[in-house]
Design a protein with these regions (language model features):
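Alpha-helical transmembrane helix bundles of large polytopic membrane transport and channel proteins
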Residues: 57-137
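Membrane-interface helix-loop junction between the first two transmembrane segments
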Residues: 18-37, 155
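Membrane-interfacial segments
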Residues: 23, 27-28, 64, 68, ...
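Intracellular loop-helix junctions on the cytosolic face of multi-pass helical membrane proteins
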Residues: 151-163
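N-terminal prosegments of processed precursors
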Residues: 2-26
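Alpha-helical transmembrane segments and their helix-start/interface "positive-inside/aromatic belt" motifs
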Residues: 1-8, 35-59, 160-179, 183
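Transmembrane alpha-helical segments in integral membrane proteins
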Residues: 14-21, 62-65, 129-152
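Extended, highly charged clamp/arch subdomains and adjacent linkers
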Residues: 34, 38, 72, 138-143
Length: 183
């Protein structure tokens, strides 16, 4: 599902690039306005403002979703009567529930596992639908914001450079921290 969302974000961002470029060209021609940057920078500005917030949200969601679902399902199984002596037994029951949901479980099913597998399917569905709605909400909100900035004939080149410098800084920081983690 995440690949589909990334693909949709890329397609929407690409279409915004062409829209932003053509919109600024038409504004410059029809209104005799001198643009503060080349039209392509307005397209880049739209792409960055559309894709970066959505991709960051998707990354954060993807990191925390499995942990949250696991804790909810383990709590659900415990409320239904499952007894865990330690963390390993809880993890084993959770993996059984996931296997039942995927249809790969070959062991004996009891009512606790069945109910927990149904709850797992329900929560997966809720989390997936929530993720899609929130990502498209972020895309729409960031697109509206960036389109308002374009209408004001902002200095898109400077803004794009600031965003790219920030991305390069974050990438360098990740590389340094990864190197320190290896050593």
């Amino acid at each position: 599902m995440n690949l589909v969302l990334i693909f949709l974000i890329i397609i929407f961002s690409s279409s915004l690039f062409f829209y932003g470029r053509s919109k600024t060209k038409s504004l410059a021609i029809s209104g005799n306005i001198k643009l503060n940057a080349l039209p392509k920078f307005y397209g880049y500005y739209l792409v960055l403002w559309c894709s970066i917030p959505a991709l960051v949200f998707l990354l954060i969601w993807s990191l925390f979703e499995p942990v949250i679902i696991k804790s909810i399902i383990i709590d659900t199984a415990a409320k239904q009567g499952a007894i865990f002596n330690d963390k390993n037994e809880a993890n084993l029951v959770y993996e059984k529930i996931k296997a039942i949901h995927l249809g790969t479980y070959l062991g004996e099913l009891d009512s606790i596992l069945k109910e927990s597998a149904l709850a797992y399917a329900k929560f997966i569905n809720i989390f997936t639908n929530s993720k899609v709605v929130l990502i498209f909400g972020i895309i729409i909100a960031s697109t509206i914001y960036s389109l308002k900035k374009i209408k004001n004939n902002n200095k898109a080149r400077d803004d794009v450079e600031v965003i790219l410098k920030g991305l390069l800084f974050v990438s360098s920081l990740i590389a340094i921290l990864t190197t320190l983690g290896i050593i």
